[in-house]
Amino acid sequence: MKARHKRLGLIVAGLAALGLGAALVLSAFQKNLVFFFTPSQVAAGEAPRNRSFRVGGMVEVGSIERQADGVTVSFLVTDTAQRLRVNYRGSLPDLFKEGKGVVAQGKLTADQLFVADEVLAKHDENYMPPEAAYALKQAGAPALAGALK
């Protein structure tokens, strides 16, 4: 009977350790999960205010403003329905251009300014992330989204 209780205790302890490990993994996964939003979704209030997320769309033509310090850049990201001002301090990718696709990761300030800590540019003229193409299509720009797939 004593050996049976030991085995039962080991099984319960093993299951508890397994459950704790799974909870820790899920917690770490959720903290590192980054969601993707369009400027229209941000304007509608769907984006989180207190955590990092990605915003994607096209860099609006004529919107790039470089600051005197040479590393701070401000530009507008649009999904053709709404636009969002993005500030970024750092080196932009070589393929970053007006009228091209972009995905920026960062946080939204109280005054609807997106402060990016990472900017990713579309890597070739025939590619657009599926999320961005779908978002552009949902925003009412099916011709543009189809042309950029």
Curated annotation (Swiss-Prot):
User: Its Gene Ontology biological processes?
Assistant: cytochrome complex assembly
* Mode of membrane association: Single-pass type II membrane protein
Q: Which cysteines link up through disulfide bonds? A: none
Query: InterPro entries recorded for this chain?
Result: CcmE (IPR004329), CcmE-like_sf (IPR036127), NA-bd_OB-fold (IPR012340)
Q: Cytoplasmic side: which ranges? A: 1-7
What SUPFAM superfamilies does this protein's entry cite?
Answer: Heme chaperone CcmE (SSF82093)
What role does it play? Heme chaperone required for the biogenesis of c-type cytochromes. Transiently binds heme delivered by CcmC and transfers the heme to apo-cytochromes in a process facilitated by CcmF and CcmH.
UniProt lists the family membership as follows:
Belongs to the CcmE/CycJ family.
Q: What is this protein called?
A: Cytochrome c-type biogenesis protein CcmE
Name its species.
Polaromonas naphthalenivorans (strain CJ2)
Supply the gene name: ccmE
